[in-house]
């Protein structure tokens, strides 16, 4: 239900050329590009980031892959090498709740970035410890400026959204604390959250997730264990 409700983040209106296909808990997005594809790729990265952000605020942390290449989608079928590439990235490289770009997409972005002194794409993407480029979806908190009457309202809205994001992560950490494989994925998202807040909201200490929540502590044997 959440996936369907937030689809408009990606396909904004009936005039959009993008197409979406949803099945079970998966979503496929196809978007045509022209010329060098910079405008379209920027748009789809923004829209998918917004979609990912909205789902995260509801406690649904998703992973995915982005590829560029030949692809066909209609109401009945989807196929093409770009679909296989994106699926491979999602299945084998994303690992954590992140949307990872494949090598072809990274190459395009590198070309775009080199055309600017201050490239707009740099705020859309982060590079993880394993070298993978992934969507910096929390950067979407900065889109709300035009919806606020002044800077104070804007900052207040940003902090409220990030605090909600923090709470959802903490809920997941607590829920999965006895399943180390799942819990580790939320540790990753917590570290991403803290990184973003440290860089952009250094003075808002209440937005940080405490480090002791991100460690797996051993304990002694209690009466309840015997």
Briefly describe each language-model feature range.
Residues 38, 42-45, 52, 73-90:
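Catalytic-core segments of nucleotide cyclases and related cyclic-nucleotide turnover enzymes
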Residues 35, 72, 105-107:
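Residues that cap or initiate secondary-structure elements
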Residues 32-33, 74-81, 110-113:
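A short acidic (Asp/Glu
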Residues 1-53, 57:
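Catalytic NTP-binding/metal-coordinating core of nucleotidyl cyclase/transferase enzymes
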Residues 54, 91, 125:
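Short, conserved, surface-exposed binding loops centered on an aromatic residue
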Residues 21-30, 60-74:
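A short glycine-enriched loop-to-beta-strand structural element that forms part of the catalytic core
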Residues 57, 63-64, 68, 85-103:
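Catalytic/regulatory signature loops of cyclic-dinucleotide turnover enzymes
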Residues 96-226:
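Intrinsically disordered, glycine/charged-rich C-terminal tails and inter-domain linkers
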């Amino acid at each position: 239900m959440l996936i369907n409700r937030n689809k408009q983040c990606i396909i904004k209106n009936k005039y959009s050329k993008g197409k979406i296909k949803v099945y079970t808990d998966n979503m496929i997005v196809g978007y045509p590009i022209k010329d060098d594809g910079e405008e379209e790729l920027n748009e789809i990265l923004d829209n998918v980031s917004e979609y990912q952000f909205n789902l995260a605020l509801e406690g649904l942390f998703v992973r995915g892959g982005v590829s560029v290449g030949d692809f066909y989608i209609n109401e009945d079928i989807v196929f093409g090498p770009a679909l296989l590439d994106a699926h491979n990235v999602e299945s084998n490289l994303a690992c954590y709740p992140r949307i990872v770009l494949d090598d072809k997409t990274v190459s395009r972005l590198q070309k775009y970035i080199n055309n600017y002194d201050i490239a707009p794409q740099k705020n859309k993407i982060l590079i993880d410890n394993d070298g993978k480029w992934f969507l910096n979806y929390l950067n979407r908190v900065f889109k709300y400026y035009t919806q606020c009457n002044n800077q104070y309202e804007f900052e207040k809205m940003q902090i409220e959204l990030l605090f909600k994001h923090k709470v959802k992560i903490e809920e997941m950490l607590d829920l999965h604390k006895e399943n180390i494989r799942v819990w580790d994925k939320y540790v990753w998202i917590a570290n991403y959250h803290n990184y973003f807040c440290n860089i952009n909201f250094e003075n808002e200490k209440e937005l940080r997730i405490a480090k002791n929540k991100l460690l797996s502590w051993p304990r002694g044997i209690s009466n309840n264990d015997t």
